[in-house]
Amino acid sequence: MLQRPPHRESFNDKEEIIDLPNLIEIQIKSYNQFLQADKFPDERENIGLQEVFTEIFPIKSYDEKTILEFLSYNLGVPKYNPEECIRRGITYNVTLKVKFRLTDETGIKEEEVYMGTIPVMTDKGTFIVNGAERVVVSQLHRSPGICFEQERHSRGNVIYSFRIIPYRGSWLEGAFDTNDLIHIYIDRKKRRRKILATTFIRALGYSSNSDIIEEFFTTRKYKIKNEKEFAKLVGKILAQDVVDEESGLVFGKASEKLTTAMLKRIVDAGIDVIRIAEDADETSPVIKMLAKDPTDSYESALKDFYRKIRPGEPATLSNARSAIMRLFFDPKRYNLGRVGRYKLNSKLGCEINDEKLQTVTLDKEDVIGALKYLIMLKSGSEEASIDDIDHLGNRRVRSVGELIQNQCRIGLARMEKIIRERMNLFDFSSDTLTPGKIVSAKGLSGVLKDFFGRSQLSQFMDQTNPIAELTHKRRLSSLGPGGLNRDRAGFEVRDVHTSHYGRICPIETPEGPNIGLISSLSSFAKINEFGFIETPYRIVREGVVTDEIEYMTADQEEQCVIAQASAPLDEYHMFAEPICWARYKGEQFETDTKNVTHMDVSPKQLVSIVTGLIPFLEHDDANRALMGSNMQRQGVPLLKPTAPIVGTGLEARAARDSGAVLIAHEDGVVDYVDGLKIVISPDDNRLEKRTYLLKKFIRSNAGTCINQRPLCHVGDKIKAGDVIADGPATDKGEVALGRNVLVAFMPWFGYNYEDAIIISEKLLREDYYTSLYIEEFELTARDTKLGKEEITRDIPNVSEETLRNLNDDGIIRIGAEVKPGDTLVGKITPKSETELAPEERLLRAIFGDKASDVKDASLIAPPGTEGVVMDVKVFSRRDRLSKTDDELVEEASKLKDIQREYKSNQAQLRTEKHERVGALLLNETAPGNIVHRRTAEIIVDEGDLITQDLIEALEKESVEDLLMPENDIYTTLRQILHDYEIALQTVETQYKTQLEFMRKGDTDLDPGVIRQVKVYVASKRKLQVGDKMAGRHGNKGVVSKIVPEADMPFLSTGQTIEIILNPLGVPSRMNMGQLFETHLGIAAKHTGITVKSPVFEGFPEEKIWEMMKKAGLPEDGKFFLYDGCSGERFDNSVVVGYIYMLKLSHLVADKIHARAVGPYSLVTQQPLGGKAQMGGQRFGEMEVWAAEAYGAAHLLQEMLTVKSDDVAGRTRIYESIVKGENLLKSGTPESFNVLIKEMQGLGLNVYTEAVDDS
């Protein structure tokens, strides 16, 4: 029978309303949208790579006679599979070919141009770059759009301001000053130039005062009939200039206050109609600004604007106009993005639809709207509010696709300049211009290479265990280009915000300088099309909680009253009580259930996946839960992993989505199983048998072992989606990072002082915490100036004993035991010949010593290496000239076999395609015309009966050349033809790769490398004193003593305790979850079941005591123990139970280090520091004080001179040791010389003088 995950008993059998989404969807979906590899070129949406090409192209030459247009792009198929790329140390990528159309004086030319390679994401959401798996972490950054802020001025009054942040381009800011005037700033960080808001509005096209007043105020026409009307208008603001049409005399300008005298002059002139700004007065900011404004027309405002942003340059009208166009109205230089436009319109209350979202530049209306809102804020209007920049409505996620898209944009923008230059410099008289001659592939592939290799967001994947891998892909970072700076980020940015609920985990974040800047997505969170994080809620209608799900962003959630998932419901899905706890605008309060609009889908939607794996999380202090979350990622995969007795129910899902386990793709029956592969016959007879290859003893990024073990047997019935093989740190398809061990919380001879852990020898004997490590050693033989390096067994001046494990080629045999200093691969390098002395030449001539012109450059096992050689891989180039006749004959025979296989595969694919197309179309009536794209010839007429001949005519054409209407039959036909072309491409790539390998060997080696050898050494690490262990509740400690099983305390049944923890580690740390887990663990173990205690809905205390009683155990969970040494009973009863403990990747064997001799620092001449540098321990300031306190003068002198940086003294002491003398004559420490040089560098004439001893 297939071993499925065991059923876990739960106290609360509430069904989940909604399944967890795919946990690595954030990576896969984003990259698929960027690449759109599965879509036909003409069906691709204008997003991702397609969008970048359409933005940059068409490119015109400076004289606009030559135009280069982008038509489509095509992606090849990968040369090797991901496993092979890791093995060879190369990048998993595909070729990118782009079809361009060039139009010039000679005509139109179309050509497909090779544009380099582009890395491809694996099924697990990772990239393989130079043989290492990497993850591109999603970035959390400030969303484009508009935000309104307030700050207190030094005088005490509040200053209001707004900021329009584009996706690309100049920032536009507006702020009140202390005189209630609004000034506009452009790129405030770069230059502090301020422009009066009305001047800026005029420069945008609102030329007159009346235009500006019309935008900001309600205006109305007044007829002056009598004295009463006359008196009513005094003190009002004019909305239009009052001009005598005949004489042209101006009686009052727009924005001026009407006085009695002015009105009298107007009436006397016979003018009886004037326009007034209804809601304006002298204190209004706009009226104040118009009074102060030095400009009065569009032209003067433009010039004034230009003088401010480009001081010192001549302010002509055309310059000014093009400057403002470039800054805000040119889509190539200024882009709000769809998200920026969405945020701007929603804040200013404008319409949001697809058409509006396409407007990516700034509008005049946007600036007017922002200024109006700012004035409303100043006036204290309830409709206007300040933005919280830490709210998730104002922060968005840039996922992998968007990050790479931005890099492609940079690469293509560089390429655009090169293309223009080439168009200009091309000599049309001597040659014909084609796209291939002006398009260079370097721009794009160079930028991508740089991004994957150097960017802060492209990270070497944490592959310690499946949970570490999964968490790394779901990580959100506020750091990186365009993000925050670790040193300048304040407390507010790092803090937990109410809008994080259900979106970002409040617990999982690193300790240290990155706290709060790096976080993790919550378990149910998704990212929407604008990059905002959404979380699901159940909709509540008239008090009834429906199963309808609505995903909401932090902004949308602000308008809703949301009940908790734990609120009790009756059988009709109505709230059981009239009052419940709910959230509104981030605040928790009790409310009437009638007001509730939504309800949480699950209590665990608050936390991330790894935090959701901690049982009884609700009983742990947040600081310890944080440590528990982080330490689960450091758990080492064990030799015999066991799933926890007390889980949370997320174990199986986490294992599945991490990619550690092997999953069946379709229903079927197991035909064959062994340690290397599983063969399944599908239930659908049309499909071939599917072979699943298992990963065997592969080295992970962290040096741990990746090994898959089959869970099924021959004859088992398999359903699609079943787990058919376990991976590292999984047990029957569930995550299993550690082991269940019998624990006692008690002190034991002081060995568990300060969180130390005592373990029984039984854990070592039964390999509870034994793990497998794999180290990789690499050696390359190159072609040097002096000759070729050679990998060989024939090494000068090396004993046969040293070479005993090397084969004839000089490479260590598989299975050999390795110790530090052993030769793994023998290599000799030519060394430069020096002129020999005559007598030396004579000796050489007599004895024929040829070995002296090469030196030994073998690969030696470094200190600390112990284990067994488990694999050796050799890669080499093949030179046709160096092959023997036999090798050439063998090669010819193999080439024939490869060609035969290639032709057979091609024929099989053609037959398969023919059968599928025949089954779909033969003797059917054509549902529409099928037309050839280039020749416009009709291949199939609508209404025709489709015959075998028509099918053969269709099959001859490429799917890209066929134009057919949208309907079910033709969509299926396109898919069949597309699948065939991809399969054919894959077969061709494999064929070419095999041919290349036969003729030239491994061509992927770096230039100059002839041969490369990789040796893999596996070592078994048992638990030892000094290793770090931890539970899931942040209860960490170091193994202090391994006690013989006979000496461990034991129960009355004779069962010995396996691990002893300090009871003082619980109360002050407030992680009571470990006690609940211990009690429930022993109850479940004695009942023979496994249990799940999901976060925030776990087993209550009463239920645990009930289970203890049922299992016949003491109700308080305390047992009397007996001393293993004396056999006497301890006085007090002790908490005993089963706890899940992990061994962490901080192993003492990797940390312990000693130095006898080794390298010294160049400047100070002191030994280097750290294990990697073979460094020493510093005898520091405090240690010197301690020695001084004892008056140990001779010891101190030795420590600070000859044992450290006294160069001459070091040599002398060495000589005296060799001669057997006991002399110490110390000189000057080098660090003293450094100090003198530094003082001399400051201009102080400091020097040492020799003093006469007498």
From Swiss-Prot:
Gene Ontology terms, MF aspect: DNA binding; DNA-directed RNA polymerase activity; ribonucleoside binding
Pfam family, one: RNA_pol_Rpb2_45
Catalysed reactions listed for this entry: RNA(n) + a ribonucleoside 5'-triphosphate = RNA(n+1) + diphosphate
Xref: PROSITE patterns: RNA_POL_BETA (PS01166)
Gene Ontology CC annotation, any one: DNA-directed RNA polymerase complex
Sorted UniProt keywords: DNA-directed RNA polymerase, Nucleotidyltransferase, Transcription, Transferase
Recorded superkingdom: Bacteria
Enzyme class, first EC level, given as a word: transferase
EC nos: 2.7.7.6
GO terms of biological process kind: DNA-templated transcription
HAMAP family per UniProt: RNApol_bact_RpoB
Similarity field: Belongs to the RNA polymerase beta chain family.
Binding partners and assembly: The RNAP catalytic core consists of 2 alpha, 1 beta, 1 beta' and 1 omega subunit. When a sigma factor is associated with the core the holoenzyme is formed, which can initiate transcription.
Biological role stated in the UniProt entry: DNA-dependent RNA polymerase catalyzes the transcription of DNA into RNA using the four ribonucleoside triphosphates as substrates.
Descriptive protein name: DNA-directed RNA polymerase subunit beta
Gene: rpoB
